[in-house]
Amino acid sequence: MNFLVISGEFPPFAGGSGTYCNYLIKALAARGHKITLITKHYKENAEQEKKIDLALSEQNIKCIRMPYFKFTFIFSWYRIISNYLKRHNDFDFVILNGNIAQLVCRKPALRKFLKKYITFQHGLSAYDTLDKNRFAALFYKRQMLDNFFKNAAANIAVSRELKDKLEQSVKMPNLHVILNCIDNEAFTFIPQNKDKNALHLTTASRLIPGKNTIAVVRLFTKLRNDFPNLYLNIAGTGSELERLKEEAERLQVTPFVNFSGQLNTKELCKLYQQSDVFILLSFYESFGLVYLEANACGVPVIGSDVGGTREAIEDGVSGFIVPLDDENIIYEKTKLLLSDTALRQKMGNAGKKRVDEKFSLDTLGKNFEKLLNGLKAEEA
């Protein structure tokens, strides 16, 4: 089949939405589908972007990058996408991944070019953007979004928890679930020559308030009283970076904290492989891809008991799910993993097996094709 995929997020800089899109198009291309991607241009990462786009072209994926300006993208993207669809309107489906793509394409004048479209939801959807962004609210009405999602061939949530939340909060119709998956060929377990005299606790995410990385820094400081050989790796960039550095300085742990910055897939995989425990204490996750990535590299994980984390982590098997409001439990579970090598290996191995069996690119491709076959059957 021939797909046009429109996504506001995509590597080199991407959160869960962009990463999911990257995996989805690779999974579909591997199964013989034709893919054209329209996404954001990152001028500050132009060289890395070129490498990513070259790799996509080698998989027969065409990538079109568009400039993004926070307050005017609605108009510029609308014009570019409309003109493109006027010239190329032979797609079987248009996939609209995330809020930006859905806000742009919900316009009636553009929707007439969208014969069949499928939306992917990664959070509280475009409704949330509308509620928070006064500028967007000037041009979009809630009823327009209601009609937009009603007319979609399918609306897909990346976790069962998110599906339930969308049905309850905005009554989104025609919702299906296709769980997040990862590239388990890129994230693999390779035994590393780890420093036997050191332990490494790792976290990776966008460094924004919602990821609650500051709680990890404070937990790490407390754990160093038990493990003087413990080091903390923080991968990612974002608005919280300077605050985190200041907190590490205040707690006098700066020499033991490594801020890795933004890492590509290969670098992130290597970081996981060198880690003993992965932790992310977000206030909310629609799923939590990083838990799967770490598990795929043989690392046990700890995540907060929120949202789709409950589906990403099998509690007591691939890691631990901990309550955000109980610092003692978070501390005790992390301490347990750091102190028990056999338990770390057991959970790391179980996590890797689980990812390979349930969350591979092949699984993602099969699940999406299964959905498409169901849509065809409904039409017949």
Residue ranges and their predicted role:
Residues 7, 45, 76-79, 93-126:
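An aromatic- and histidine-rich active-site surface loop
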Residues 283:
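Aromatic "clamp/platform" in nucleotide-sugar-dependent glycosyltransferases that forms part
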Residues 262-263, 270-275:
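Short alpha-helical donor nucleotide-sugar binding micro-motif in glycosyltransferases
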Residues 300-303, 313:
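Short hydrophobic beta-strand element within catalytic cores of glycosyltransferases
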Residues 161, 181:
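Carbohydrate-associated surface elements
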Residues 315-316, 320-327, 336-341:
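Conserved acidic donor-binding segment of nucleotide-sugar-dependent glycosyltransferases
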Residues 137-155:
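Membrane-proximal helix-turn-helix segments that form the acceptor-binding/catalytic region
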